[in-house]
A protein has these predicted regions:
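Structural motif
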Residues: 18, 51-58, 104-109, 136-141
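N-terminal hydrophobic signal/anchor transmembrane helix of membrane proteins
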Residues: 21, 37-42, 61-78, 143-160
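Acidic/histidine-rich alpha-helical segments that form the ligand environment
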Residues: 106-146
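Secretory/endomembrane lumenal or extracellular ectodomains immediately following the signal peptide
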Residues: 1-56, 175-176
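Acidic, carboxylate-rich catalytic segments that either coordinate divalent cations
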Residues: 132-134, 141, 150, 154-176
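Histidine/lysine/aspartate-rich catalytic loop segments that bind and position anionic ligands
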Residues: 80-106
Length: 176
């Protein structure tokens, strides 16, 4: 069991000061003892510095795997060319797009894709998958990668709810 008794999550309870405005955002909404998303986000350094820490290629990978998990044509089509420009290889993009096995990918790519597939497909991340992603990215970067994926999942929900179409003349790039 990898759950800490004090926080009731995979990260131990932590007292402030926080790197982000966690208290202002989540202080009223947190359950007793400061549990909840703000407590977890406090382990990150913030999405504004994530790209500098992990590189554009991995940021694009996180965005694409999230777009694919939500079948978000808009997000996929807007980000897939940027992912290629950032150095994300076409064979890795194909693994995401066509839900192919992650065997043979480098460790960070495989860990991130496996993590996201469980998170968005099973609505849970199993202990072994979590440990693999933690080893690949470290605690701070993993928290911020999940925050990035969460932000893009929220975007996918908004785009789907309001049936956002691609810009005029832009061909869809996500096929199933």
């Amino acid at each position: 069991n990898d759950i800490y008794p004090d926080s009731r999550s995979r990260l131990p309870l932590r007292s402030g000061p926080y790197q982000t405005s966690v208290t202002a955002l989540y202080g009223r909404m947190a359950s007793p003892g400061g549990l909840g998303p703000g407590q977890i986000r406090a382990y990150g350094d913030g999405m504004q510095t994530l790209e500098a820490r992990v590189g554009t290629r991995l940021v694009m990978l996180a965005i694409l795997v999230t777009a694919r998990a939500h079948d978000s044509q808009y997000e996929w089509t807007m980000y897939q060319p940027r992912a290629l420009e950032s150095g994300l290889e076409l064979h890795v993009i194909d693994v995401i797009q066509y839900d192919r096995p992650i065997d043979g990918l480098n460790e960070k790519d495989a860990a991130l894709i496996g993590f996201a597939r469980e998170l968005f497909g099973d609505y849970n991340v199993f202990s072994g998958t979590y440990v693999r992603a933690l080893a690949a990215f470290g605690q701070t970067d993993l928290v911020d990668i999940v925050a990035l994926m969460g932000a893009h999942a929220a975007d996918a929900a908004v785009l789907a709810a309001f049936d956002q179409r691609l810009p005029e003349g832009v061909e869809p790039l996500l096929s199933f």
